[in-house]
Regions:
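Structural motif
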Residues: 5, 73-74, 114
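N-terminal Rossmann NAD(P)H-binding glycine-rich loop of SDR-like oxidoreductase domains
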Residues: 5-26
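Mobile, glycine- and charge-enriched loop segments
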Residues: 9, 33, 62-88, 93, ...
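SDR active-site strand-loop-helix element
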Residues: 9, 33, 78-79, 115-121, ...
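Conserved glycine-rich Rossmann-like NAD(P)H-binding loop of the short-chain dehydrogenase/reductase
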Residues: 28-36
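NAD(P)H-binding glycine-rich loop region in Rossmannoid oxidoreductase-like domains
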Residues: 38, 42, 46-102, 106-109
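Conserved Rossmann-fold NAD(P)-dependent oxidoreductase catalytic core, especially the SDR/UDP-sugar
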Residues: 86-138, 143, 149
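Oxidoreductase cofactor-interface core, primarily capturing Rossmann-like NAD(P)-dependent enzymes
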Residues: 125-227
Length: 258
């Protein structure tokens, strides 16, 4: 059986690398687009540099994306920004809509069958401007007629690493009535390995059953033991990149760090 080729934007980031590892474990061929940076791509990717194809490209620069979509069945777009800085021109619209538009055009021009957008679930602790930009990005992909899947993901964390008490409480409330009945399961932070494995399995489905997926859908694509124990294939964040709770898609341009 032919291995499906999947392109991921955001190589060298917490989310991008977790998705790459999950897809490799499922038998896919993976290509990573790594944003130009002072740190060499090989160093940012670690062992993934030898297990994937990778190229340097900037999703905010359409010219750098030219030709990278060819030969791929699916493209997963992971990059955006949860923290805006309008003084530097880094609005929610620029960070999330412009990057999505550029990747969508790469997919159309390169013959990519389907684009998966890592979007965000609405939650009280998530900025409304960020959510609005994500929804506009979702609508743009649909508007241009590109087959797409939307992952409205919560915040993620690496198992075994400290998290603020607030986020631990939010994860616990996911299964406690009445919070479990009012959509909390969609918003509660989840382990990165569960999210990555769920997205990988959706990406490899020939005919996804729905257009928009939330955290409960991702959990259902993990076995009981995977949900309980996690998996060793997910690369743990380095000391330099580790955060108690991770923004789902932050990889802002111009060397800017939120």
């Amino acid at each position: 059986m032919t291995r499906k080729r999947v392109l991921i934007t955001g190589g060298g980031t917490f989310l991008g690398d977790a998705l790459a590892a999950a897809l490799l474990a499922e038998g896919a061929e993976v290509t990573l687009l790594v944003r130009p940076d002072k740190i060499p791509p090989e160093e940012r990717l670690g062992s993934l540099a030898d297990r994937t194809r990778w190229y340097t490209a900037d999703v905010w620069n359409p010219a750098s994306l030219k030709g990278h979509g060819r030969g791929h069945a699916v493209a997963i777009h992971t990059i955006g920004g949860m923290t805006a800085d309008p003084a530097q021109g880094l609005t929610y619209q620029y960070l999330n809509i412009v990057s999505t538009r550029n990747v969508a055009h790469m997919c159309v021009n390169g013959g990519v069958n389907r684009m998966i957008l890592m979007s965000a679930a609405r939650a009280p602790w998530i900025n409304a401007g960020y959510i609005a930009a994500k929804r506009e990005a979702e609508a743009y992909i649909e508007r241009i007629g590109l087959a797409n899947t939307i992952i409205r993901a919560p915040l993620v964390y690496a198992r075994g690493h400290p998290r603020p008490l607030f986020y631990r409480l939010m994860s616990w409330l996911r299964v406690v009535p009445p919070f479990a009945w009012i959509g909390w399961q969609r918003a509660a932070p989840m382990p990165i390995d569960i999210l990555a494995r769920g997205v990988a399995r959706i990406a490899l489905e020939d005919s996804p059953g729905k257009k928009i997926y939330y955290a409960p859908d991702l959990r259902r694509r993990n076995t009981w033991s995977e949900r309980r124990r996690g998996s060793a294939y997910i690369t743990q964040p380095t000391a330099a990149s580790r955060r108690p709770i991770d923004r789902i898609d932050d990889d802002a341009p111009f060397g800017w760090t939120p």
